[in-house]
Protein backbone atom coordinates (compact mmCIF):
# COMPACT_ATOMS: atom_id res chain seq x y z
CA UNK A 1 0.00 0.00 0.00
CA UNK A 2 1.40 3.44 -1.01
CA UNK A 3 1.84 6.22 1.53
CA UNK A 4 0.23 9.63 0.75
CA UNK A 5 3.57 11.51 0.21
CA UNK A 6 4.57 8.86 -2.34
CA UNK A 7 1.26 9.31 -4.20
CA UNK A 8 1.71 13.11 -4.31
CA UNK A 9 5.29 12.71 -5.55
CA UNK A 10 3.97 10.62 -8.44
CA UNK A 11 1.19 13.11 -9.22
CA UNK A 12 3.28 16.30 -9.41
CA UNK A 13 5.10 15.59 -12.70
CA UNK A 14 1.77 14.57 -14.26
CA UNK A 15 0.22 17.99 -13.52
CA UNK A 16 3.15 19.69 -15.25
CA UNK A 17 2.68 17.58 -18.35
CA UNK A 18 -1.10 18.06 -18.49
CA UNK A 19 -1.24 21.79 -17.67
CA UNK A 20 2.02 23.57 -18.50
CA UNK A 21 0.16 26.94 -18.67
CA UNK A 22 -0.53 26.66 -14.92
CA UNK A 23 3.13 26.53 -14.06
CA UNK A 24 4.64 28.86 -16.67
CA UNK A 25 3.47 31.76 -18.85
CA UNK A 26 4.68 32.47 -22.39
CA UNK A 27 8.37 33.20 -22.77
CA UNK A 28 9.27 36.87 -23.28
CA UNK A 29 11.46 38.59 -25.83
CA UNK A 30 13.27 41.73 -24.62
CA UNK A 31 14.89 44.43 -26.75
CA UNK A 32 16.87 47.42 -25.49
CA UNK A 33 17.66 50.99 -26.54
CA UNK A 34 18.14 51.92 -30.18
CA UNK A 35 17.11 48.46 -31.51
CA UNK A 36 13.72 48.60 -29.77
CA UNK A 37 13.10 52.23 -30.73
CA UNK A 38 14.00 51.64 -34.39
CA UNK A 39 11.47 48.79 -34.69
CA UNK A 40 8.73 50.73 -32.90
CA UNK A 41 9.37 53.71 -35.19
CA UNK A 42 8.87 51.48 -38.25
CA UNK A 43 5.41 50.58 -36.88
CA UNK A 44 4.63 54.24 -36.18
CA UNK A 45 5.71 55.14 -39.75
CA UNK A 46 3.60 52.40 -41.35
CA UNK A 47 0.45 53.45 -39.50
CA UNK A 48 1.04 57.19 -39.99
CA UNK A 49 1.72 56.73 -43.74
CA UNK A 50 -1.57 54.83 -44.15
CA UNK A 51 -3.54 57.47 -42.22
CA UNK A 52 -1.78 60.55 -43.72
CA UNK A 53 -3.01 59.81 -47.27
CA UNK A 54 -6.57 60.69 -46.16
CA UNK A 55 -5.65 64.23 -45.02
CA UNK A 56 -6.98 67.37 -46.68
CA UNK A 57 -9.51 68.00 -49.47
CA UNK A 58 -7.37 66.11 -51.99
CA UNK A 59 -6.61 63.22 -49.62
CA UNK A 60 -7.27 59.72 -50.95
CA UNK A 61 -9.46 56.94 -49.59
CA UNK A 62 -8.23 53.71 -48.00
CA UNK A 63 -9.77 50.30 -48.77
CA UNK A 64 -9.88 47.95 -45.78
CA UNK A 65 -10.51 44.21 -46.05
CA UNK A 66 -13.16 43.01 -43.59
CA UNK A 67 -13.65 39.56 -42.09
CA UNK A 68 -17.18 39.55 -43.55
CA UNK A 69 -19.00 41.44 -46.30
CA UNK A 70 -17.56 43.90 -48.80
CA UNK A 71 -14.28 45.78 -48.20
CA UNK A 72 -14.74 49.12 -46.41
CA UNK A 73 -13.84 52.29 -48.30
CA UNK A 74 -13.09 55.18 -45.95
CA UNK A 75 -11.40 58.55 -45.58
CA UNK A 76 -11.74 58.52 -41.80
CA UNK A 77 -8.35 58.51 -40.05
CA UNK A 78 -9.39 56.63 -36.92
CA UNK A 79 -11.07 53.85 -38.96
CA UNK A 80 -7.82 53.35 -40.91
CA UNK A 81 -5.74 53.42 -37.70
CA UNK A 82 -7.97 50.86 -35.96
CA UNK A 83 -7.72 48.45 -38.90
CA UNK A 84 -3.92 48.15 -38.71
CA UNK A 85 -2.41 45.14 -36.93
CA UNK A 86 1.23 44.30 -37.73
CA UNK A 87 2.81 40.84 -37.64
CA UNK A 88 6.07 42.00 -35.99
CA UNK A 89 5.31 42.54 -32.29
CA UNK A 90 7.78 45.43 -31.82
CA UNK A 91 6.47 47.30 -34.85
CA UNK A 92 2.94 46.58 -33.66
CA UNK A 93 3.62 48.16 -30.24
CA UNK A 94 4.67 51.41 -31.98
CA UNK A 95 1.61 51.31 -34.24
CA UNK A 96 -0.77 50.57 -31.33
CA UNK A 97 0.53 53.51 -29.27
CA UNK A 98 -0.20 55.91 -32.15
CA UNK A 99 -3.52 54.14 -32.67
CA UNK A 100 -4.33 55.13 -29.08
CA UNK A 101 -3.62 58.78 -29.98
CA UNK A 102 -6.20 58.60 -32.81
CA UNK A 103 -8.73 56.82 -30.55
CA UNK A 104 -8.35 59.35 -27.72
CA UNK A 105 -8.74 62.30 -30.09
CA UNK A 106 -11.79 60.69 -31.68
CA UNK A 107 -13.43 60.05 -28.30
CA UNK A 108 -12.76 63.55 -26.99
CA UNK A 109 -13.29 65.72 -30.08
CA UNK A 110 -14.86 63.31 -32.61
CA UNK A 111 -12.57 64.48 -35.43
CA UNK A 112 -8.92 65.47 -36.06
CA UNK A 113 -7.62 61.90 -35.85
CA UNK A 114 -5.45 62.22 -38.97
CA UNK A 115 -3.90 65.45 -37.65
CA UNK A 116 -3.19 63.76 -34.30
CA UNK A 117 -1.53 60.79 -36.04
CA UNK A 118 0.84 62.85 -38.22
CA UNK A 119 1.75 65.08 -35.25
CA UNK A 120 2.49 62.01 -33.07
CA UNK A 121 4.71 60.49 -35.77
CA UNK A 122 6.70 63.71 -36.13
CA UNK A 123 7.28 64.09 -32.36
CA UNK A 124 8.27 60.42 -31.94
CA UNK A 125 10.60 60.44 -34.96
CA UNK A 126 12.43 63.63 -33.97
CA UNK A 127 12.56 62.55 -30.33
CA UNK A 128 14.16 59.18 -31.19
CA UNK A 129 16.71 60.93 -33.40
CA UNK A 130 17.79 63.34 -30.63
CA UNK A 131 17.96 60.58 -28.00
CA UNK A 132 20.26 58.53 -30.25
CA UNK A 133 22.65 61.52 -30.13
CA UNK A 134 22.73 61.52 -26.33
CA UNK A 135 19.89 63.89 -25.31
CA UNK A 136 17.96 63.21 -22.10
CA UNK A 137 14.49 61.82 -23.03
CA UNK A 138 12.83 62.96 -19.77
CA UNK A 139 13.96 66.58 -20.27
CA UNK A 140 12.94 66.45 -23.97
CA UNK A 141 9.44 65.39 -22.85
CA UNK A 142 9.31 68.33 -20.41
CA UNK A 143 10.32 70.71 -23.21
CA UNK A 144 7.67 69.22 -25.52
CA UNK A 145 4.88 69.63 -22.93
CA UNK A 146 6.06 73.19 -22.12
CA UNK A 147 5.77 74.09 -25.81
CA UNK A 148 2.37 72.37 -26.16
CA UNK A 149 0.95 74.38 -23.24
CA UNK A 150 2.13 77.60 -24.94
CA UNK A 151 0.54 76.54 -28.27
CA UNK A 152 -2.80 75.72 -26.59
CA UNK A 153 -2.82 79.14 -24.88
CA UNK A 154 -2.14 80.77 -28.28
CA UNK A 155 -4.92 78.72 -29.96
CA UNK A 156 -7.38 79.98 -27.34
CA UNK A 157 -6.36 83.57 -28.18
CA UNK A 158 -6.91 82.92 -31.92
CA UNK A 159 -10.26 81.17 -31.35
CA UNK A 160 -13.51 82.88 -32.36
CA UNK A 161 -17.00 81.77 -31.32
CA UNK A 162 -19.33 80.24 -33.92
CA UNK A 163 -22.26 82.62 -34.32
CA UNK A 164 -24.03 82.01 -37.64
CA UNK A 165 -25.58 78.97 -39.38
CA UNK A 166 -23.21 79.72 -42.30
CA UNK A 167 -20.17 79.16 -40.05
CA UNK A 168 -21.66 75.89 -38.79
CA UNK A 169 -22.16 74.80 -42.42
CA UNK A 170 -18.53 75.78 -43.25
CA UNK A 171 -17.10 73.71 -40.36
CA UNK A 172 -19.22 70.70 -41.37
CA UNK A 173 -18.27 71.08 -45.07
CA UNK A 174 -14.52 71.11 -44.32
CA UNK A 175 -14.79 68.05 -42.08
CA UNK A 176 -16.91 66.21 -44.67
CA UNK A 177 -14.10 66.60 -47.24
CA UNK A 178 -15.60 69.64 -48.95
CA UNK A 179 -19.11 68.18 -49.38
CA UNK A 180 -21.36 71.28 -49.18
CA UNK A 181 -24.54 69.20 -49.17
CA UNK A 182 -23.48 67.52 -45.90
CA UNK A 183 -22.46 70.91 -44.46
CA UNK A 184 -25.87 72.43 -45.21
CA UNK A 185 -27.90 69.48 -43.94
CA UNK A 186 -26.02 69.51 -40.59
CA UNK A 187 -26.48 73.28 -40.32
CA UNK A 188 -30.24 72.84 -40.95
CA UNK A 189 -30.44 70.10 -38.31
CA UNK A 190 -28.74 72.32 -35.71
CA UNK A 191 -31.02 75.21 -36.60
CA UNK A 192 -34.09 73.05 -35.99
CA UNK A 193 -33.17 71.12 -32.82
CA UNK A 194 -30.84 73.66 -31.23
CA UNK A 195 -27.09 73.48 -30.77
CA UNK A 196 -27.40 71.01 -27.92
CA UNK A 197 -30.18 68.99 -29.55
CA UNK A 198 -29.71 65.32 -30.41
CA UNK A 199 -28.73 64.58 -34.03
CA UNK A 200 -28.41 60.95 -35.09
CA UNK A 201 -27.02 59.47 -38.33
CA UNK A 202 -28.75 56.49 -39.98
CA UNK A 203 -28.71 54.61 -43.28
CA UNK A 204 -31.22 56.13 -45.68
CA UNK A 205 -33.57 54.25 -48.00
CA UNK A 206 -33.11 56.55 -51.02
CA UNK A 207 -30.28 57.84 -53.23
CA UNK A 208 -30.33 61.29 -51.57
CA UNK A 209 -29.54 62.50 -48.06
CA UNK A 210 -32.61 63.39 -46.02
CA UNK A 211 -33.24 65.25 -42.77
CA UNK A 212 -36.13 64.16 -40.55
CA UNK A 213 -37.06 66.21 -37.49
CA UNK A 214 -38.93 64.30 -34.78
CA UNK A 215 -40.57 66.76 -32.40
CA UNK A 216 -42.22 65.73 -29.16
CA UNK A 217 -42.01 62.22 -27.74
CA UNK A 218 -41.65 59.50 -30.34
CA UNK A 219 -41.12 55.88 -29.31
CA UNK A 220 -40.94 52.59 -31.21
CA UNK A 221 -44.20 50.94 -30.11
CA UNK A 222 -47.34 50.94 -32.29
CA UNK A 223 -51.01 50.22 -31.60
CA UNK A 224 -51.74 46.88 -29.91
CA UNK A 225 -54.60 46.13 -32.35
CA UNK A 226 -55.15 47.40 -35.93
CA UNK A 227 -58.85 47.93 -35.02
CA UNK A 228 -57.79 51.20 -33.36
CA UNK A 229 -56.98 52.74 -36.79
CA UNK A 230 -59.21 55.77 -37.42
CA UNK A 231 -57.83 57.10 -40.75
CA UNK A 232 -58.04 55.28 -44.06
CA UNK A 233 -54.96 57.09 -45.33
CA UNK A 234 -51.66 55.85 -43.91
CA UNK A 235 -53.05 53.10 -41.65
CA UNK A 236 -52.70 55.10 -38.44
CA UNK A 237 -54.64 56.41 -35.48
CA UNK A 238 -54.69 60.21 -35.06
CA UNK A 239 -56.22 62.29 -32.29
CA UNK A 240 -56.22 66.00 -31.47
CA UNK A 241 -56.30 67.29 -27.89
CA UNK A 242 -56.23 63.90 -26.12
CA UNK A 243 -55.90 62.50 -22.58
CA UNK A 244 -53.07 60.04 -21.79
CA UNK A 245 -53.35 57.21 -19.23
CA UNK A 246 -49.93 55.83 -18.18
CA UNK A 247 -49.51 52.51 -16.37
CA UNK A 248 -46.43 50.49 -15.41
CA UNK A 249 -48.54 47.36 -14.99
CA UNK A 250 -50.44 45.16 -17.43
CA UNK A 251 -54.14 46.02 -17.89
CA UNK A 252 -56.38 42.96 -18.30
CA UNK A 253 -59.61 43.93 -16.50
CA UNK A 254 -62.01 46.39 -18.14
CA UNK A 255 -63.23 47.52 -14.69
CA UNK A 256 -59.82 49.09 -13.97
CA UNK A 257 -60.02 51.48 -16.96
CA UNK A 258 -63.76 52.31 -16.96
CA UNK A 259 -63.21 55.38 -14.67
CA UNK A 260 -60.57 56.79 -17.07
CA UNK A 261 -62.87 56.19 -20.07
CA UNK A 262 -65.73 57.93 -18.26
CA UNK A 263 -63.54 61.00 -17.51
CA UNK A 264 -62.42 61.18 -21.18
CA UNK A 265 -66.03 60.78 -22.36
CA UNK A 266 -67.33 63.45 -19.95
CA UNK A 267 -64.74 65.93 -21.26
CA UNK A 268 -65.30 64.75 -24.87
CA UNK A 269 -61.61 63.89 -25.31
CA UNK A 270 -59.95 60.85 -26.93
CA UNK A 271 -57.97 58.55 -24.58
CA UNK A 272 -54.49 57.13 -25.23
CA UNK A 273 -53.60 54.19 -22.96
CA UNK A 274 -49.86 53.46 -22.62
CA UNK A 275 -49.21 50.42 -20.40
CA UNK A 276 -46.90 47.41 -20.07
CA UNK A 277 -49.61 45.59 -22.04
CA UNK A 278 -53.36 45.67 -22.60
CA UNK A 279 -54.92 42.25 -23.18
CA UNK A 280 -57.79 39.90 -22.35
CA UNK A 281 -61.16 41.38 -21.43
CA UNK A 282 -59.81 44.97 -21.41
CA UNK A 283 -58.53 44.81 -25.01
CA UNK A 284 -61.56 43.00 -26.45
CA UNK A 285 -64.01 45.46 -24.80
CA UNK A 286 -62.03 48.50 -26.04
CA UNK A 287 -61.94 47.12 -29.61
CA UNK A 288 -65.67 46.28 -29.50
CA UNK A 289 -66.61 49.78 -28.31
CA UNK A 290 -64.28 51.33 -30.87
CA UNK A 291 -66.01 49.45 -33.70
CA UNK A 292 -69.64 49.62 -32.43
CA UNK A 293 -69.95 53.12 -30.94
CA UNK A 294 -66.83 54.83 -32.32
CA UNK A 295 -65.12 55.13 -28.91
CA UNK A 296 -62.09 57.39 -29.36
CA UNK A 297 -59.37 55.27 -27.77
CA UNK A 298 -56.04 53.64 -28.65
CA UNK A 299 -53.88 51.25 -26.59
CA UNK A 300 -50.09 51.19 -26.95
CA UNK A 301 -47.40 49.11 -25.21
CA UNK A 302 -44.92 51.13 -23.14
CA UNK A 303 -41.44 51.41 -24.74
CA UNK A 304 -38.24 49.87 -23.37
CA UNK A 305 -37.67 47.30 -20.63
CA UNK A 306 -37.02 47.33 -16.88
CA UNK A 307 -35.69 50.61 -15.47
CA UNK A 308 -35.54 52.17 -18.93
CA UNK A 309 -39.32 51.63 -19.33
CA UNK A 310 -40.01 53.17 -15.89
CA UNK A 311 -37.86 56.19 -16.74
CA UNK A 312 -39.53 56.70 -20.13
CA UNK A 313 -43.03 56.48 -18.61
CA UNK A 314 -42.01 59.02 -15.95
CA UNK A 315 -40.67 61.31 -18.73
CA UNK A 316 -44.01 61.02 -20.55
CA UNK A 317 -45.90 61.81 -17.33
CA UNK A 318 -43.83 64.97 -16.75
CA UNK A 319 -44.06 66.05 -20.42
CA UNK A 320 -47.85 65.62 -20.47
CA UNK A 321 -48.64 66.67 -16.88
CA UNK A 322 -50.01 63.28 -15.80
CA UNK A 323 -49.11 60.50 -13.36
CA UNK A 324 -47.81 56.93 -13.77
CA UNK A 325 -50.10 54.29 -12.23
CA UNK A 326 -48.47 51.26 -10.62
CA UNK A 327 -45.28 53.24 -9.89
CA UNK A 328 -43.38 51.99 -6.83
CA UNK A 329 -43.94 54.09 -3.71
CA UNK A 330 -47.25 55.54 -5.00
CA UNK A 331 -50.63 54.25 -3.90
CA UNK A 332 -52.46 55.30 -7.09
CA UNK A 333 -54.98 52.74 -8.33
CA UNK A 334 -56.42 52.86 -11.84
CA UNK A 335 -59.94 52.63 -10.38
CA UNK A 336 -59.38 55.87 -8.38
CA UNK A 337 -58.19 57.96 -11.36
CA UNK A 338 -58.97 61.70 -11.29
CA UNK A 339 -58.87 64.13 -14.27
CA UNK A 340 -55.56 65.65 -13.02
CA UNK A 341 -53.92 62.16 -13.12
CA UNK A 342 -54.32 61.97 -16.90
CA UNK A 343 -51.69 63.53 -19.16
CA UNK A 344 -52.75 65.99 -21.85
CA UNK A 345 -51.32 66.31 -25.38
CA UNK A 346 -52.20 68.51 -28.36
CA UNK A 347 -51.77 65.74 -30.94
CA UNK A 348 -51.24 61.97 -31.04
CA UNK A 349 -50.16 59.87 -34.04
CA UNK A 350 -49.92 56.07 -33.66
CA UNK A 351 -48.85 53.74 -36.50
CA UNK A 352 -48.24 49.99 -36.41
CA UNK A 353 -44.54 50.59 -35.58
CA UNK A 354 -44.37 53.77 -33.50
CA UNK A 355 -46.26 56.39 -31.54
CA UNK A 356 -45.77 60.14 -31.25
CA UNK A 357 -47.05 62.45 -28.50
CA UNK A 358 -46.87 66.09 -29.64
CA UNK A 359 -47.43 69.38 -27.80
CA UNK A 360 -47.48 67.94 -24.27
CA UNK A 361 -49.19 70.15 -21.67
CA UNK A 362 -46.73 69.42 -18.83
CA UNK A 363 -45.47 72.02 -16.36
CA UNK A 364 -42.43 73.79 -17.88
CA UNK A 365 -40.62 74.00 -14.51
CA UNK A 366 -41.06 70.24 -13.93
CA UNK A 367 -39.82 69.46 -17.46
CA UNK A 368 -36.74 71.67 -16.92
CA UNK A 369 -36.06 69.96 -13.58
CA UNK A 370 -36.28 66.53 -15.26
CA UNK A 371 -33.90 67.69 -18.02
CA UNK A 372 -31.36 68.78 -15.38
CA UNK A 373 -31.63 65.37 -13.66
CA UNK A 374 -30.86 63.60 -16.96
CA UNK A 375 -27.90 65.94 -17.65
CA UNK A 376 -26.49 65.13 -14.19
CA UNK A 377 -26.84 61.39 -14.89
CA UNK A 378 -25.06 61.89 -18.23
CA UNK A 379 -22.10 63.49 -16.45
CA UNK A 380 -21.57 60.54 -14.10
CA UNK A 381 -22.37 57.51 -16.28
CA UNK A 382 -19.52 55.69 -18.06
CA UNK A 383 -21.57 53.18 -20.08
CA UNK A 384 -21.90 54.10 -23.78
CA UNK A 385 -25.30 52.34 -23.92
CA UNK A 386 -26.56 54.34 -20.92
CA UNK A 387 -25.30 57.59 -22.49
CA UNK A 388 -27.13 56.82 -25.73
CA UNK A 389 -30.41 56.12 -23.88
CA UNK A 390 -30.05 59.24 -21.68
CA UNK A 391 -29.36 61.41 -24.76
CA UNK A 392 -32.48 60.03 -26.46
CA UNK A 393 -34.59 60.84 -23.39
CA UNK A 394 -33.03 64.30 -23.15
CA UNK A 395 -33.88 65.05 -26.78
CA UNK A 396 -37.49 63.95 -26.38
CA UNK A 397 -37.95 66.31 -23.43
CA UNK A 398 -36.13 69.27 -25.00
CA UNK A 399 -35.97 70.24 -28.68
CA UNK A 400 -36.70 66.93 -30.35
CA UNK A 401 -34.45 64.71 -32.47
CA UNK A 402 -32.96 65.32 -35.92
CA UNK A 403 -32.28 62.17 -37.94
CA UNK A 404 -29.82 62.47 -40.85
CA UNK A 405 -30.59 59.70 -43.33
CA UNK A 406 -27.54 59.09 -45.52
CA UNK A 407 -28.42 57.99 -49.06
CA UNK A 408 -26.39 56.25 -51.76
CA UNK A 409 -26.40 53.61 -54.49
CA UNK A 410 -24.72 50.83 -52.46
CA UNK A 411 -23.83 49.85 -48.89
CA UNK A 412 -20.15 50.65 -49.55
CA UNK A 413 -21.01 54.20 -50.69
CA UNK A 414 -23.45 54.78 -47.81
CA UNK A 415 -20.93 53.57 -45.20
CA UNK A 416 -18.14 55.79 -46.59
CA UNK A 417 -20.46 58.80 -46.60
CA UNK A 418 -21.76 57.95 -43.12
CA UNK A 419 -18.17 58.14 -41.77
CA UNK A 420 -17.82 61.64 -43.23
CA UNK A 421 -21.22 62.78 -41.93
CA UNK A 422 -20.37 61.53 -38.42
CA UNK A 423 -17.00 63.34 -38.54
CA UNK A 424 -18.67 66.53 -39.76
CA UNK A 425 -21.28 66.33 -37.02
CA UNK A 426 -18.63 65.83 -34.32
CA UNK A 427 -16.53 68.70 -35.70
CA UNK A 428 -19.57 70.98 -35.70
CA UNK A 429 -20.40 70.16 -32.08
CA UNK A 430 -16.76 70.81 -31.13
CA UNK A 431 -16.86 74.18 -32.94
CA UNK A 432 -20.01 75.22 -31.09
CA UNK A 433 -18.35 74.22 -27.81
CA UNK A 434 -14.95 75.96 -28.08
CA UNK A 435 -15.07 78.12 -31.21
CA UNK A 436 -13.10 78.04 -34.47
CA UNK A 437 -9.58 78.79 -35.76
CA UNK A 438 -8.04 78.92 -39.26
CA UNK A 439 -8.16 75.60 -41.10
CA UNK A 440 -5.70 73.83 -43.39
CA UNK A 441 -3.04 73.56 -40.65
CA UNK A 442 -2.68 77.38 -40.55
CA UNK A 443 -3.74 77.78 -36.91
CA UNK A 444 -0.76 75.68 -35.76
CA UNK A 445 1.62 77.60 -38.05
CA UNK A 446 0.44 80.89 -36.51
CA UNK A 447 1.36 79.52 -33.04
CA UNK A 448 5.07 79.02 -33.90
CA UNK A 449 6.15 82.63 -33.03
CA UNK A 450 4.65 82.21 -29.53
CA UNK A 451 7.30 79.55 -28.78
CA UNK A 452 10.18 82.04 -29.22
CA UNK A 453 9.41 83.67 -25.87
CA UNK A 454 9.70 80.41 -23.88
CA UNK A 455 12.67 80.01 -21.52
CA UNK A 456 13.71 76.34 -21.19
CA UNK A 457 15.52 75.20 -18.02
CA UNK A 458 18.27 73.41 -20.00
CA UNK A 459 19.47 72.47 -23.50
CA UNK A 460 17.42 69.25 -23.66
CA UNK A 461 14.18 71.13 -22.91
CA UNK A 462 15.15 73.54 -25.69
CA UNK A 463 15.41 70.52 -28.03
CA UNK A 464 11.83 69.54 -27.01
CA UNK A 465 10.56 73.05 -27.88
CA UNK A 466 12.36 72.93 -31.26
CA UNK A 467 10.74 69.53 -31.97
CA UNK A 468 7.27 71.10 -31.48
CA UNK A 469 8.22 74.09 -33.69
CA UNK A 470 9.00 71.74 -36.57
CA UNK A 471 6.03 69.46 -35.80
CA UNK A 472 3.52 72.33 -36.06
CA UNK A 473 4.37 72.60 -39.78
CA UNK A 474 3.52 68.95 -40.50
CA UNK A 475 -0.31 69.14 -40.96
CA UNK A 476 -0.06 71.99 -43.53
CA UNK A 477 2.79 70.16 -45.32
CA UNK A 478 0.81 66.88 -45.44
CA UNK A 479 -2.28 68.63 -46.89
CA UNK A 480 -0.07 70.28 -49.55
CA UNK A 481 1.72 67.01 -50.34
CA UNK A 482 -1.61 65.20 -50.84
CA UNK A 483 -2.61 68.00 -53.23
CA UNK A 484 0.54 67.29 -55.28
CA UNK A 485 2.62 70.37 -54.33
CA UNK A 486 5.83 70.88 -52.35
CA UNK A 487 4.84 71.19 -48.68
CA UNK A 488 7.86 73.13 -47.37
CA UNK A 489 7.43 75.87 -50.02
CA UNK A 490 3.74 76.26 -49.17
CA UNK A 491 4.51 76.53 -45.44
CA UNK A 492 7.20 79.19 -46.05
CA UNK A 493 4.81 81.27 -48.13
CA UNK A 494 2.03 81.02 -45.50
CA UNK A 495 4.48 82.09 -42.76
CA UNK A 496 5.44 85.19 -44.76
CA UNK A 497 1.79 86.15 -45.48
CA UNK A 498 -0.67 88.08 -43.28
CA UNK A 499 -2.34 86.27 -40.37
CA UNK A 500 -5.56 85.12 -42.11
CA UNK A 501 -3.93 83.94 -45.36
CA UNK A 502 -3.50 80.21 -45.95
CA UNK A 503 -3.36 77.62 -48.72
CA UNK A 504 -6.61 76.38 -50.27
CA UNK A 505 -5.54 72.91 -51.43
CA UNK A 506 -8.76 72.36 -53.40
CA UNK A 507 -8.32 75.50 -55.52
CA UNK A 508 -4.49 75.40 -55.41
CA UNK A 509 -4.25 79.04 -54.34
CA UNK A 510 -3.41 81.28 -51.36
CA UNK A 511 -6.62 82.79 -49.96
CA UNK A 512 -8.11 84.50 -46.91
CA UNK A 513 -9.11 81.37 -44.96
CA UNK A 514 -11.91 83.07 -42.98
CA UNK A 515 -13.59 84.56 -46.08
CA UNK A 516 -13.28 81.23 -47.92
CA UNK A 517 -14.74 79.36 -44.92
CA UNK A 518 -11.70 77.09 -44.42
CA UNK A 519 -11.91 76.78 -40.65
CA UNK A 520 -11.35 74.11 -37.99
CA UNK A 521 -12.90 73.68 -34.54
CA UNK A 522 -10.48 74.87 -31.81
CA UNK A 523 -11.30 71.79 -29.72
CA UNK A 524 -10.26 69.43 -32.53
CA UNK A 525 -6.88 71.14 -33.12
CA UNK A 526 -6.19 71.44 -29.37
CA UNK A 527 -7.09 67.80 -28.62
CA UNK A 528 -5.08 66.47 -31.58
CA UNK A 529 -1.91 68.27 -30.44
CA UNK A 530 -2.32 67.45 -26.75
CA UNK A 531 -2.98 63.73 -27.31
CA UNK A 532 -0.19 63.41 -29.91
CA UNK A 533 2.40 65.15 -27.71
CA UNK A 534 1.44 63.19 -24.59
CA UNK A 535 1.78 59.72 -26.12
CA UNK A 536 4.64 60.42 -28.57
CA UNK A 537 6.89 62.15 -26.00
CA UNK A 538 6.24 59.27 -23.59
CA UNK A 539 7.19 56.84 -26.37
CA UNK A 540 10.59 58.55 -26.68
CA UNK A 541 11.37 57.87 -23.00
CA UNK A 542 11.16 54.08 -23.57
CA UNK A 543 14.45 52.19 -23.14
CA UNK A 544 13.20 48.58 -22.99
CA UNK A 545 10.39 46.79 -24.84
CA UNK A 546 9.09 43.40 -23.66
CA UNK A 547 6.94 41.20 -25.92
CA UNK A 548 5.58 37.67 -25.68
CA UNK A 549 6.98 34.87 -27.82
CA UNK A 550 3.96 32.81 -28.90
CA UNK A 551 4.31 29.15 -27.94
CA UNK A 552 4.57 26.84 -30.92
CA UNK A 553 1.73 24.32 -30.88
CA UNK A 554 2.76 20.73 -31.48
CA UNK A 555 0.68 18.46 -33.74
CA UNK A 556 -1.96 17.12 -31.32
CA UNK A 557 -1.95 13.34 -30.93
CA UNK A 558 -1.43 12.15 -34.51
CA UNK A 559 0.88 9.37 -33.30
CA UNK A 560 -1.76 8.04 -30.93
CA UNK A 561 -4.26 8.01 -33.78
CA UNK A 562 -1.92 5.89 -35.86
CA UNK A 563 -1.42 3.46 -32.96
CA UNK A 564 -5.13 3.26 -32.46
CA UNK A 565 -5.64 2.42 -36.12
CA UNK A 566 -3.05 -0.36 -35.89
CA UNK A 567 -4.74 -1.81 -32.82
CA UNK A 568 -8.06 -1.82 -34.55
CA UNK A 569 -6.59 -3.53 -37.55
CA UNK A 570 -5.06 -6.21 -35.30
CA UNK A 571 -8.37 -6.80 -33.60
CA UNK A 572 -10.15 -7.40 -36.85
CA UNK A 573 -7.81 -10.08 -38.13
From Swiss-Prot:
Signal peptide (from-to): none
Entry function: Chaperonin implicated in mitochondrial protein import and macromolecular assembly. Together with Hsp10, facilitates the correct folding of imported proteins. May also prevent misfolding and promote the refolding and proper assembly of unfolded polypeptides generated under stress conditions in the mitochondrial matrix. The functional units of these chaperonins consist of heptameric rings of the large subunit Hsp60, which function as a back-to-back double ring.
Organism field: Homo sapiens
Family (UniProt): Belongs to the chaperonin (HSP60) family.
Pathological association: Spastic paraplegia 13, autosomal dominant: A form of spastic paraplegia, a neurodegenerative disorder characterized by a slow, gradual, progressive weakness and spasticity of the lower limbs. Rate of progression and the severity of symptoms are quite variable. Initial symptoms may include difficulty with balance, weakness and stiffness in the legs, muscle spasms, and dragging the toes when walking. In some forms of the disorder, bladder symptoms (such as incontinence) may appear, or the weakness and stiffness may spread to other parts of the body.
Domain of life: Eukaryota
Residues bearing PTM N6-malonyllysine: 133
Record keywords: Acetylation, ATP-binding, Chaperone, Disease variant, Hereditary spastic paraplegia, Host-virus interaction, Isomerase, Isopeptide bond, Leukodystrophy, Mitochondrion, Neurodegeneration, Nucleotide-binding, Phosphoprotein, Transit peptide, Ubl conjugation
Name by which UniProt lists this protein: 60 kDa heat shock protein, mitochondrial
Keyword Cytoplasm annotated: no
One of the protein's GO biological processes: isotype switching to IgG isotypes
Modified residues (Phosphotyrosine): 90
Gene: HSPD1
Amino acid sequence: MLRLPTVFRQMRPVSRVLAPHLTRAYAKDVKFGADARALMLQGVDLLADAVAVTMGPKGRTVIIEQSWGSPKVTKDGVTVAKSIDLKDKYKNIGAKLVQDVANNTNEEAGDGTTTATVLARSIAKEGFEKISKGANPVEIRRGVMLAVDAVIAELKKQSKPVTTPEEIAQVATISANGDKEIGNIISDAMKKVGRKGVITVKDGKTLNDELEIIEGMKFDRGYISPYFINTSKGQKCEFQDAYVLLSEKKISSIQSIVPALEIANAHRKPLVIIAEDVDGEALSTLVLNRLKVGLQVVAVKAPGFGDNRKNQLKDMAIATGGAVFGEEGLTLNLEDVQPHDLGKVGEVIVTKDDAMLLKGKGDKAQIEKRIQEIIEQLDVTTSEYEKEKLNERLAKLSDGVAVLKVGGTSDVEVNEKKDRVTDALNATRAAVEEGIVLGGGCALLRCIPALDSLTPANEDQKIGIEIIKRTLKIPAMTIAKNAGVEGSLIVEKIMQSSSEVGYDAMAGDFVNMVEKGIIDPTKVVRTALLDAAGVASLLTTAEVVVTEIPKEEKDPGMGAMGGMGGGMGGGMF
